[in-house]
UniProtKB/Swiss-Prot annotation:
Origin species: Rotavirus A (strain RVA/Cow/United States/NCDV-Lincoln/1969/G6P6[1])
Keyword Coiled coil (UniProt): yes
GO (cellular component) term, any one: host cell cytoplasm
GO process annotations (BP): regulation of translation
Residue stretches in coiled coil: 166-237
SUPFAM superfamilies attached to this UniProt entry: NSP3 homodimer (SSF69903), Rotavirus nonstructural proteins (SSF58030)
Location of region: Interaction with host EIF4G1: 208-313
Quaternary structure (record): Homodimer. Interacts (via the coiled-coil region) with host ZC3H7B (via LD motif). Interacts with host EIF4G1.
Molecular functions (GO terms): RNA binding
Protein localization: Host cytoplasm
Protein name in the entry: Non-structural protein 3
Predominant location: host cell
HAMAP family from the UniProt entry: ROTA_A_NSP3, ROTA_NSP3
Amino acid sequence: MSKMESTQQMASSIINTSFEAAVVAATSTLELMGIQYDYNEVYTRVKSKFDYVMDDSGVKNNLLGKAATYDQALNGKFGSAARNRNWMADTRTTARLDEDVNKLRMMLSSKGIDQKMRVLNACFNVKRVPGKSSSIIKCTRLMRDKIERGEVEVDDSFVEEKMEVDTIDWKSRYEQLEKRFESLKQRVNEKYTSWVQKAKKVNENMYSLQNVISQQQSQIADLQNYCNKLEVDLQNKISSLVSSVEWYLKSMELPDEIKTDIEQQLNSIDVINPINAIDDFESLIRNIILDYDRIFLMFKGLMRQCNYEYTYE
């Protein structure tokens, strides 16, 4: 960039510096508020908004255009400067500026910023005093001009009204507030007491329920132990019964085939599960009764063939 474009360079630098200041202000505000943020995200969002506002409002092009006009004037080209001067002095330009000002005033009114607020903001500035809660109110040049033109008046009615406000009976106001506070305190205490009683009742019911559950669990454990003992006793009794029958079977004068068949049926009895063992005993007894019935029928038939009669005594 040549030396005679220094004004454009300075304007561009001011715009870039304004953007950096906006980023620093945003991040500093977030840090003071204790809000965690991503610097890259804040930078991107501020840049997007800043570029949009500067471009949409025409401020950037206006500044760079004026800077280019100054550079052309420094280079000895006064044509653009003369056109800008004539444009600024033209009645149509003045009318457009008045129209823009009126639009801005109506826009401020629509946002709730009325004439009183606009005038007060234009007449006064507030200067903060470092290290103090108070501040200094400074009058602007507009306020000084209004005083010189006699456009500033003192409203005596406001002073009298202010004096009446200062004579408020603060003692009675304090007593009223104290009564309201005591009433509110009493209601809060009543609610708190009610909540405490409900909480105690809930705790008592919970402890009572826990005791009932504990007793039931103890009874269930006792019943379980009793059932386990009964099951063990039945298993031992069944095992002893099977052994006793096997020993008794061996002392009989039955054929070996019959003994083997009965022993197999005895060995098939489920000694571990008493329910299955009872079913096995039932099957064994049915088989024995069936064999006895068949033997009796054979004996009965043999007696008839031999012309013998039989009787039960």
